[in-house]
């Protein structure tokens, strides 16, 4: 019989072992769809981003106009821009659900895969932040000013660091130029990290909802999970297209329709919705350095997850106490997201502070305690 080129060719063999003949647990649920959706999001963002970059001018006097020109005069420019802007939202929805799945099912116990995943999240957040600055509207400009200014909280070298990042004494043309360069570069770094992430994942194989080894009865990835992932893709594409075609500006800020003006500060400076939970934690601490540390900790706490796992079972499938705390954590994050979008006024300040304390308490104290208690309950 002639050798199958899919299994013998040096390059196709790698693709085959990663996407076609990959041994996969037979019982992984729809929660395992998000990895492939994130890959599709990344490809879509790189393609739409490249097309937008061909019409974009990274200059503070022309950036706003060039984006406007893309939407008005370029064939389907409006669609490409709307898909790119709302594609970022879909990217974050998928990555947050992907992380939530990892937390619920104990996937973080694959430490290397988990750590590269956290690096991917940080790279994605950096990409989204520098990308938001490029249209050079009011919120772009002031968002860049506020967030880059946080680096000035670093003791001793803070101010120098900020001025080095700005390329001057304020956010200006050099800042925009370098942000464009970074926004172009970072997605390719994300793509490279994704390959590392997958390499580590394929070392151990996928986890599954029961959290038990499934080596004895794995099934090939294709056709079973390729079909399942295409269904997931349809479910993601529907809201994305609905958003991009019917209400493309729903998730954006109206302030960004005004060109950047360093002399006028918007009444409420706030980032895009996917950063609001972290922004709420940042604002809930009345000290600059403390706020910056809490902001960093809110994301970097994910790196501690493997060390906070105290249960004898891997997943939360059969752990009702941990389940309750997990969903409390999700609700808490939604509250933080809401608070981040509100002005710094009376009821919101205290709610934000309580939600921030609850966030860290749930992860660092209550979940490990519940796991230990559940271990004891197993004996009775």
Curated annotation (Swiss-Prot):
Binds 2 heme b groups non-covalently. A ubiquinone binds at residue 202. InterPro entries: Cyt_b/b6_C, Cyt_b/b6_C_sf, Cyt_b/b6_N, Cytb/b6-like_sf, Cytochrome_b, Cytochrome_b_C_euk/bac, Cytochrome_b_N_euk/bac, Di-haem_cyt_TM. It holds the Pfam family Cytochrom_B_C. Heme 1 (or BL or b562) is low-potential and absorbs at about 562 nm, and heme 2 (or BH or b566) is high-potential and absorbs at about 566 nm. Belongs to the cytochrome b family. The cytochrome bc1 complex contains 11 subunits: 3 respiratory subunits (MT-CYB, CYC1 and UQCRFS1), 2 core proteins (UQCRC1 and UQCRC2) and 6 low-molecular weight proteins (UQCRH/QCR6, UQCRB/QCR7, UQCRQ/QCR8, UQCR10/QCR9, UQCR11/QCR10 and a cleavage product of UQCRFS1). This cytochrome bc1 complex then forms a dimer. This is Cytochrome b.
């Amino acid at each position: 019989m002639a050798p199958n080129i899919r299994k013998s060719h040096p390059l196709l063999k790698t693709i085959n072992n990663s996407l076609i003949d990959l041994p996969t647990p037979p019982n992984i649920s729809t929660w395992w769809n998000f990895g492939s959706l994130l890959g599709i999001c990344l490809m879509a963002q790189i393609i739409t981003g490249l097309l937008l970059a061909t019409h974009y001018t990274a200059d503070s006097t022309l950036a706003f106009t060039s984006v406007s020109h893309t939407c008005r005069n370029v064939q389907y420019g409006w669609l490409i821009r709307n898909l790119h802007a709302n594609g970022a939202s879909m990217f974050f929805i998928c990555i947050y659900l992907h992380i939530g799945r990892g937390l619920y099912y104990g996937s973080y116990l694959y430490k290397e895969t988990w750590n590269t995943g956290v690096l991917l999240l940080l790279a994605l957040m950096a990409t989204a932040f520098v990308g938001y600055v490029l249209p050079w509207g009011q919120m772009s400009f002031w968002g860049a000013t506020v967030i880059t200014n946080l680096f000035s909280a670093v003791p001793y070298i803070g101010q120098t660091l900020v001025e080095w990042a700005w390329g001057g004494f304020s956010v200006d043309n050099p800042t925009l130029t370098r942000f464009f360069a970074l926004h172009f570069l970072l997605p390719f770094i994300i793509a490279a990290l994704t390959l590392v992430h997958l390499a580590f994942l394929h070392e151990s194989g996928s986890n599954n909802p029961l959290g038990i080894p499934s080596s004895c009865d794995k099934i090939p990835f294709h056709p079973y999970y390729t079909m399942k992932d295409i269904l997931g893709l349809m479910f993601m594409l529907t809201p994305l297209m609905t958003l991009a075609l019917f209400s493309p500006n729903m998730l954006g800020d109206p302030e960004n329709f005004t060109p950047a003006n360093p002399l006028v500060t918007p009444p409420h400076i706030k980032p895009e919705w996917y950063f609001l939970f972290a922004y709420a934690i940042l604002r809930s601490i009345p000290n600059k350095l403390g706020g910056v540390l809490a902001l960093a900790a809110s994301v970097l706490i994910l790196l501690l997850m493997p060390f906070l796992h105290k249960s004898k079972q891997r997943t939360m499938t059969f752990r009702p106490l941990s389940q309750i705390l997990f969903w409390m954590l999700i609700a808490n994050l939604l509250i933080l997201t809401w608070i981040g979008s509100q002005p710094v006024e009376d009821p919101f300040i205290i709610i934000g502070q309580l939600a921030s304390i609850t966030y860290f308490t749930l992860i660092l104290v209550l979940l490990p305690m519940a796991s230990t208690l559940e271990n004891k309950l197993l004996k009775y």
